[in-house]
A protein has these predicted regions:
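A short, well-ordered alpha-helix in the C-terminal region of glycosyltransferases
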Residues: 308-322
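C-terminal alpha-helical cap of glycosyltransferases
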Residues: 301, 321-338
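C-terminal "capping" alpha-helix adjacent to the active site of nucleotide-linked donor transferases
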Residues: 285-286, 290-307
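A short helix/loop element that forms part of the nucleotide-sugar donor recognition site in Leloir-type
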Residues: 53-55, 150-162
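Active-site-proximal region of nucleotide-activated glycan assembly enzymes
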Residues: 17, 25, 37, 96-154
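Acidic donor-binding loop of glycosyltransferase active sites
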Residues: 77-79, 233-247, 254
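Conserved nucleotide-sugar phosphate-binding/catalytic loop shared by glycosyltransferases and other
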Residues: 12-63, 69, 142-144, 202-204, ...
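Donor-nucleotide binding loops and adjacent catalytic segments primarily
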Residues: 28-30, 155, 162-240, 270-274, ...
């Protein structure tokens, strides 16, 4: 949802009106908070393990397609953008059946099920990474859209109570958090030798908040988009999963220690992590090899070697695609005849 909001902001800056069609999960909170109207449909992902759930999902998809066609008839958009996922499938198909130009975005290093089905008929498919076999004028590598960058480093550090001389490590693992990272970070960073901003997620926060924390250990359940951007601006090193946030890490020119989620679809987080590692911007630790001792050693060595930290930061910055949202917005406006 964050990439879609970034594109919406770029479209709005060009004078376009934007309406979201989504489900009733995160978008039900994020979209209205960002100032955009949201229309909802009922759909669910296609289960690959439960035949009963798969049949139910197909039934809901048929209803979602009919509902999507009705909404598009009412809204009469000049173009539709699909971001992949269980809602984008029926909405994208509805757009094609109504002959509305469709632009797709793919956040991962492979096309998801909905995008694979819709890509042959889409006006443009905007890719975060080059994907083997996806070439030609229909495909364009734009990078993954990210929110606007945070404020300047000095004000961001002041906001988080980080002294000018302190080094800061930012830890996060998605909205629910990442249990392996949460546990390893708390044990590895108990010395208080540097400042830590740790966004642990909803699932683990009640338990972790009961633990004694060293000075300078800032444990948070959640940060909104603006605060998260400031946290990135304030820190010197990131410890995180390797989802779409790798593009935000790169946009801020940050070195990273990445722990890919081992059960991600098509293992795309490992591919994301390799992308940063090959460029010299990240150290990759497989989830099964993450221990507090190894994490403490890796972080201590990095923070003690300022020249290596700076080289990784430069490599990260070279990977950045800060104009991705504007490039995708331009594709949508062109498809819409603007």
């Amino acid at each position: 949802m964050v990439p879609a909001l970034a594109v919406a902001d770029a479209l709005r800056a060009e004078g376009a009106e934007v309406t979201f069609i989504g489900g009733e999960r995160a978008e039900a909170e994020l979209v209205p908070a960002a100032g955009y109207p949201l229309r909802t449909i009922s759909a669910e992902g296609l289960s690959r393990t439960s035949p009963l759930r798969a049949v139910r999902a197909l039934g809901r998809a048929a209803l979602a397609l009919a509902h999507s066609r009705s909404l598009l008839a009412e809204l009469s958009p000049d173009a539709v953008m699909g971001g992949g996922g269980y809602v984008a499938g029926p909405v994208g198909l509805a757009a094609l059946t109504r002959r509305i130009p469709l632009v797709l975005t793919e956040a991962d290093g492979h096309l998801g099920l909905a995008n694979r089905a819709l890509a042959p008929a889409a006006r443009r498919v905007c890719l975060s990474f080059p994907i083997e076999g996806r070439h030609g004028k229909r495909y364009r590598v734009t990078g993954r859209p990210i929110p606007a960058l945070g404020g300047d480093r000095a004000s961001a550090r002041e906001r988080f109570g980080i002294a000018a001389h302190e080094l800061c490590v930012l830890v996060f693992g998605g909205s629910l958090g990442a249990r392996s990272i949460n546990q390893a970070a708390l044990d590895a960073f108990a010395s208080g030798a540097f400042h830590v901003v740790h966004i642990c997620g909803r699932r683990d926060y009640p338990e972790l908040a009961q633990r004694p924390l060293p000075r300078g250990y800032d444990l948070r359940e959640y940060l909104d988009l603006e605060d998260f951007a400031d946290a990135l601006a304030a820190c010197d090193l990131v410890l995180a999963r390797a989802g779409g946030s790798v593009f935000e890490i790169a946009a801020h020119g940050l070195p990273a220690i990445l722990v890919p989620y081992p059960h991600a679809s098509a293992d795309h987080q490992s591919a994301n992590a390799r992308w940063m590692s090959r460029a010299g911007a990240a150290i990759v630790i497989p989830d099964g090899e993450l221990t507090a001792a190894r994490l403490a050693r890796e972080v201590a060595e990095l923070l003690a070697n300022r020249s290596r930290l700076a080289a990784m930061a430069s490599a990260s910055r070279r990977l950045a695609r800060p104009d991705a949202a504007r490039e995708i917005a331009a594709e949508i406006l062109e498809a819409a005849g603007r």
